[in-house]
Regions:
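Glycine-rich nucleotide cofactor-binding entry segment
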Residues: 1-171, 203-208, 255-281, 285-287, ...
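Polybasic, low-complexity RNA-engagement segments
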Residues: 1-13, 17-48, 294-297, 304-457
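Short glycine-centered segments of the SAM/dcSAM-binding site in methyltransferase folds
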Residues: 103-104, 128, 174, 223-226, ...
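Helix-to-beta-strand junctions that scaffold the AdoMet/dcAdoMet cofactor pocket
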Residues: 124, 220-222
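Mobile active-site "lid"/loop adjacent to the S-adenosyl-L-methionine
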Residues: 137, 174-215, 227, 231-239, ...
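S-adenosyl-L-methionine-dependent methyltransferase catalytic core, i.e., the SAM/SAH-binding region
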Residues: 151, 162, 173-174, 179, ...
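Core SAM-dependent methyltransferase catalytic element
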Residues: 174, 248, 276, 283-316
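Conserved catalytic/ligand-binding micro-motifs in nucleotide and anionic cofactor chemistry
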Residues: 245
Length: 457
């Protein structure tokens, strides 16, 4: 049952519609998966899936799963990065940004990574996706999930929104703010959300959301687009939040939230939830529990100015070329400390420990890289030899020695921000030979020219 505060507030706002819109909370929480375009198409997935599902109304790549005992984390497709287990309405926000390959995209509150994986699929390996999480333990889980999903162009940060906005002003073409919220849409799925819910929490989350939105506005380039979303129904965090933002930021305009997609879902916003401030609620979107999801709110905001021209496919802008050249030169000169080597097994164990520590509330920011050492020059030479044999398409990619192994970096400036991963960790040297890392195959497996194909069909 919802809290007394929640029920009183919503009955006052909705009147007789309360019973209709909140008819579903007594039922079992909806379950779903979102398919990655980096792996397959929704049509191919639907044909091959060995569990009952139906297309989700909230996202063309998402499906509702109708099997109560289904364990998505145990399915081979999960481990292969084919899908991300995601509550159906949670998949709705990312497509609304209209991300195109080559863009610079920021997911400001990204953990555990479901929406970031959708944004990465839209980028198709071009441009850069900056996925940030403030809580260190959750940032480790975010990094692990993006590796599993085969994302090759992500920069994973463990930072505050304010530091990102200061370091990268007007840098991003698209920004997603899936804000930390009071979680009223999670009452069925997460009992702890119901236990912690109170009026003070709503006010606290509204204040935090406003601060994050201001940082997002500073990081967004002229002509860029920002999507704000929550999984709550509180007016202060939804329509009221957006209306107040527009008062503070006259350089922004509210756009039709569905303007970048060719489908519709949910309901329009509510006039009596704007806090008395002007807002065209027909341009924002709500998903109520009775509509097939747990609950979501979304708005799209456009910053005044001319959008950045995207580079042609396969090309970098002059400044991106400088960033990559600087990273490559740093690797050649061995500016990093001599790298401790690790085999693939020890790397996987380190990732497992990081996930375990995250669950227990602690954090490991570095890998246990195992025994032995190799110089940066030795590591790079071993990678080049391995790449020529198995991944010739990657031979010309800039490579640097970092964190105990070889990294294929993303075109991204040196900012002083706390970076957990910026590119693909392809492997390391052990006893004189190159040992590939799992991330190499999740990100670039299709480029391998000397391997045996496997299929789950």
């Amino acid at each position: 049952m919802p809290t007394e505060y929640f029920e009183q507030r919503e009955r006052a706002l909705l009147g007789q519609r309360y019973e209709q819109l909140y008819a579903a909370p007594q039922q079992t929480a909806e379950r779903g998966v979102t398919v990655s375009a980096l792996r397959t198409t929704p049509e191919q997935f639907a044909q091959r899936a060995d569990f009952p599902l139906e297309p989700s109304p909230f996202c063309k790549a998402a499906f509702v799963v109708h099997q109560p005992d289904f364990k998505p984390g145990r399915h081979p497709y999960h481990h292969a990065g084919v899908f991300y287990s995601q509550e159906p309405s949670a998949s709705s926000a990312a497509p609304l940004l209209g991300v195109q390959p080559g863009m610079r995209v920021l997911d400001l509150c990204a953990a555990p990574g479901g929406k970031s994986s959708q944004l990465a699929a839209a980028l198709q390996g071009r441009g850069v996706l900056v996925s940030n999480e403030y809580v260190a333990a959750r940032a480790e889980i975010l990094k692990s999930n993006l590796e599993r999903m085969g994302v090759s162009n992500a920069v994973v940060l463990n930072e505050t929104p304010a530091r990102i906005a200061e370091a990268l002003p007007e840098f991003f073409d698209r920004v997603l703010v899936d804000a930390p919220c009071s979680g009223e849409g999670m009452f069925r799925k997460e009992p702890v959300a119901l236990q912690q819910h109170c009026e003070a929490l709503v006010k606290q989350c509204a204040e935090l959301g406003a601060q994050i939105l201001d940082c997002a506005a500073a990081a967004l380039a002229p002509g860029g687009q920002l999507v704000y979303s929550t999984c709550t129904f509180a007016p202060e965090e939804d329509e009221g939040q957006v209306a107040a933002f527009l008062q503070r930021h006259p350089e922004f305009a509210l756009a039709d939230v569905l303007g970048n997609v060719d489908y519709t879902f949910g309901s329009v916003g509510e006039e009596n939830r704007t806090g008395g401030l002007p807002l065209d609620v027909s341009k924002v979107r709500r998903i109520w529990p009775c509509q097939g999801g747990e609950g979501h709110f979304m708005a799209r905001l456009v910053k005044a100015g001319t959008p950045r021209t995207l580079p042609p496919e396969g090309e970098y802008t002059p400044e991106e070329q400088l960033w990559l050249a600087a990273a490559a030169e740093a690797g050649k000169k061995g500016k990093a400390k001599p790298a401790k080597v690790a085999d693939a097994r020890s790397a996987r164990r380190a990732d497992s420990r990081a996930c375990r520590d995250a669950v227990q509330g602690t954090s490991r920011r570095t890998r246990d890289t195992g025994a032995g050492e190799a110089t940066p020059a030795q590591s790079l030479a071993a990678w080049q030899e391995f790449a020529r044999q198995y991944f010739p398409a990657l031979v010309q990619r800039p490579a640097v020695v970092h964190g105990g192994g070889v990294l294929l970096p993303v075109a991204f400036p040196q900012t002083g921000l706390h970076v957990l991963r910026a590119g693909v960790f392809v492997g390391s040297v052990q006893k004189g030979r190159f040992v590939p890392e799992h991330h190499l195959f999740t990100a670039f497996g299709s480029l391998c020219t000397n391997c045996e194909p496997l299929t789950l069909a």
